[in-house]
Structure formats: C-alpha cells, structure tokens
C-alpha cells in the first residue's frame, strides 16, 4: 500500500528509471512507499545484509507485491513470467494472471470459501478500486512486510520463505472504527521461479480468519501496551 507519487525506493525494483517510462500505473503515477518504508525500518525484526539470500528474496517479494497492486498492464510486470503465472491462497484454486488483474491483488489474496454471511471482508463483493480504498483508509501508513526466514536458494526452482505482514489500524474498516492497534499476521510462501528468477507461481499460506478478526477489536498486546487509542506504526 502506498500513496500516488514518490522518488526512488531502496527495497523494490522496477519502480523508477528508464525501464518504467511507459509503465501504466493504476493511480497515474508510481506509488510512494516512504511511510511504509519508515515503518518497516522501525519495526522489522530482521535486517538482512544487502546481497544476502534473504535480502534478495525480500526484494523479490516487495517488488512482486508492488507490481501486482499498482501496475495495470501485464507487460509492465517484470517480476513475473509473462507467459506462465498463477497465484493461490491457502490451497484454493490457482488464479491466472488475468483473473488476478481483474479482481485485484487484495481480493485475490483474501480469497475464501466461507459463506458470504460469515465474511468480515467479502472479496467477491469488492472491486479493485473499492478494495484498494478500504485498505488504504484502514492503514494510512501502509502495511509493511518482511521476510523472516528463507528455506531454499533464490536461484532454485522453488523459493520457500516465512514472512510477517503488519500495520496499524488508524482508519475505519468496513464500518468498524479504528482502534489504533497493530494488525499483523505471519505466513509461508512458495515462489516457483524460472531461470531468470521471475515468478511463475505464487502459493501463500496464512491464517486469514485471525487476521481479519483483528480489525474488529484491538489485539490484547497492543491494547495493553498503551492507553492511547492511536498507536504508532503501519505499511
């Protein structure tokens, strides 16, 4: 998540430069990750050395996420294989690139088989635009992501890693008032990559229910940490 304009970015590739002059951006300009990068740097639990396996995988993850959310045309997405790409969440049916682009990255990531009446957030009832607005409103500073561990080489056919995703609910979410507390979840991802380390298939596994439930009330740890209703941090 990011605002509409910005300078260079030290954690993501394919965001600025000559190669992006013809890129079509969803909001008309490259996103600005300054606020979320600040949160990331302040609250990350791992600081990987530049050029390390973990740093390379983290850069690929952040770049992939940026391109899926902010680049409109498939041909502008340089972190994924142009001909072969699919993504799945929690073992559900893999989605093609066209399906992901049509429904949006947020909705694809939050796919569920729960009956509609039990959904805190219903990705099937949201458009790309409404989903983006919903999460930008809830997390005005964004929702940071870091790689915690890598279980294989980034040059392998499969890259398996553990990640942490977090932010602070400082805005309303689907009618629920902001509680100012930290909202976070942990998960595991497997990137299937080609010989150029472009993602051909992305498989994410995480606890969706607990993540969304944390929008409804301040997490116990965050609530006890401060009496202030607005607490710091988000990406």
Curated annotation (Swiss-Prot):
Keyword Phosphoprotein appears in the UniProt entry: no
Induction: By fungus Bipolaris sorokiniana infection.
Gene3D superfamilies: 3.10.450.50
InterPro entries to which the protein is assigned, alphabetical: NTF2-like_dom_sf, Pathogen-related_defense
Keywords: Pathogenesis-related protein, Plant defense
GO BP terms, alphabetized: defense response
Protein name in UniProt: Pathogen-related protein
Organism: Hordeum vulgare (Barley)
């Amino acid at each position: 998540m990011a605002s509409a304009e910005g300078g260079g970015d030290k954690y993501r590739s394919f965001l600025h430069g000559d190669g992006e002059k013809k890129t079509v951006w969803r909001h008309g300009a490259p996103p600005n990750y300054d606020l979320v990068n600040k949160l990331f740097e302040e609250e990350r639990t791992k600081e990987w050395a530049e050029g390390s396996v973990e740093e390379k995988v983290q850069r690929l993850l952040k770049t992939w996420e940026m391109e899926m959310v902010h680049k409109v045309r498939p041909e502008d997405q340089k972190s994924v294989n142009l001909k072969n790409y699919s993504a799945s969440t929690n073992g559900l049916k893999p989605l093609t690139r066209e399906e992901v682009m049509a429904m949006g990255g947020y909705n694809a990531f939050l796919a569920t088989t729960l009956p509609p009446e039990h959904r805190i957030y219903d990705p099937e009832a949201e458009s790309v635009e409404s989903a983006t607005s919903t999460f930008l409103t809830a997390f005005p500073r964004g929702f940071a992501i870091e790689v915690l561990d890598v279980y294989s080489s980034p040059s392998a056919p499969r890259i398996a890693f553990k990640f942490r995703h977090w932010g602070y609910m400082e805005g309303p979410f689907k009618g629920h008032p902001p509680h100012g507390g930290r909202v976070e979840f942990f998960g595991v991802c497997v990137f299937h990559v080609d010989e150029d380390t472009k993602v051909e298939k992305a498989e994410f596994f995480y606890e969706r229910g607990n993540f969304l439930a944390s929008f409804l009330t301040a997490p116990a740890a965050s609530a006890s940490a401060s009496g202030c209703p607005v607490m710091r941090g988000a990406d």
